[in-house]
Amino acid sequence: MPSPKLVNGQVVYNNEQIRPIYSGNINDVKVLPANQIYGEGLFFAFDIDKIKEWSETYGLENYYKTTLENGSMGEFLASEMGIYGRAKYYLLHTFSHLIMKELEFSCGYPTASLSERLYYSDEMCGVLIYTADGAEGSMGGLVWQGQPELIEKIIISALQRASDCSADPLCWDNSDGLNKAACFSCAMVSETSCEQGNMGLDRRALVDPEFGYFKDLI
């Protein structure tokens, strides 16, 4: 698959197998099909400037580029990460999974009832963890966990739990699998809950003693 290109702030793919859902000029499209979901969620926004500074300080773009070049990452996702930032993606995506798993451990939410939405581009860096109406835990409990005193404990507990895995040291040092330093024991969730099929996860982006973004919190 050819690499996507950034044209006028939009990602464009030059491939006959990838076609838009509309025909004609994109500027003439006023309505797009969508699904409206009723439920509740927690939104986490990251400071893009701080993440950029963190990535540059530790040279993480080159570090993760080497990881992607071993062929373990899908070309589509690898190309997108090359445009918007590899370190930023690993940080955002892994954080999302760790919070979902921590909500399961500390609050009783099964991860299969939760979903993520990654807001990931050159201008966005955030994640929405939500549950749809009718799913388990969609009666106000998820929003309740967003109170400052509760969500702080959840985040710190998730980071502390991510420092160890029952599959370590193999999980922490693994560089040949689908994900680097991630498995179902520590960071992977149900594939119905993940936007990217559990690809692009690395606990070290968050908790590595040398370059982890949250290393000073644990």
Regions from the PLM with identified roles:
Residues 1-218:
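Extended, well-ordered protein cores
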